[in-house]
Structure formats: C-alpha cells, structure tokens
C-alpha cells in the first residue's frame, strides 16, 4: 500500500509542477513590462541616444542590409517590440550607473569621534555607549 501511496503522491507533485510551469499570458507580461519601466525607466537611455546610436551603426549605411533585416527577425527582437521595450545600449546604461555612483557622496570610513579605527575584528559597543576595538 505504501508503494501506491508514494506513486500517487509523486504523480500529484508532477501535475502541480506542470500547472505552475505553464507560460504566462500576454497581459501579465505587459503589466510586468509597465511596472519595470516605471521602476527602472530612468536607467534606460533617452530616445536621443537611441537615434544617435542608429545613425552611428554601420548597418544603417547599408541599404541592402536594412532590406534583408526585416526578413531575418529574431525571436528576442520580436518579443522586445511586443513587450514595448525600447532598444538600449549596455554602454549607456553602464555610463549612467557610474555617473550616479560618482555623484553620491561616499561615507567616511576613517576614525570617528566616538572611538578608534575599526581594526581587524571591528569594534564593540559597551553598555555605557563606549566603543572599543577588538584588536588585530
């Protein structure tokens, strides 16, 4: 009897996993796309940068390549258009992230007014509020 019980439990588990693994509907993908764009849209480059990138690309100067490009549509390109994602360049995103990091002030990690430097093992805060180093 335990063999049949374990078989049915396993079968139930497989059916549950298959039910969870089915693809999401297009509505949920569009909703997710809108939420991500609202949340992280400021990291994407503006349309001006996209226009400059298209002008600078060597493919834009070849008319026969542009004619053939519409025939050779890749699935990930089609999906990005369907979701409403704008094409972006990794360099522009990286440049914006580095600019944001350089504009944020870094926290001073030296000696503080309340105690010694942090040393090898950090500091200990005593009951009376005094900080002492744990040594090296």
Swiss-Prot record:
Chief location of this protein within or outside the cell: secreted
Location in the cell: Secreted
Pfam families: ANP (PF00212)
Tissue expression remark: CNP-115 is differentially processed to produce CNP-38 and CNP-39 in the heart and CNP-22 in the brain.
Cysteines paired by S-S bonds: 120-136
Signal peptide positions (record): 1-21
Gene Ontology molecular functions: hormone activity
GO cellular component: extracellular region
Keyword terms, alphabetized: Cleavage on pair of basic residues, Disulfide bond, Hormone, Secreted, Signal, Vasoactive
Domain of life per record: Eukaryota
Keyword Chloroplast appears in the UniProt entry: no
A single BP term in Gene Ontology: receptor guanylyl cyclase signaling pathway
Alphabetical list of PANTHER family matching this protein: C-TYPE NATRIURETIC PEPTIDE (PTHR12167), C-TYPE NATRIURETIC PEPTIDE 3-LIKE PRECURSOR (PTHR12167:SF5)
Function: Hormone which may be vasoactive and natriuretic. Has a cGMP-stimulating activity.
Family according to the record: Belongs to the natriuretic peptide family.
Protein name: C-type natriuretic peptide prohormone
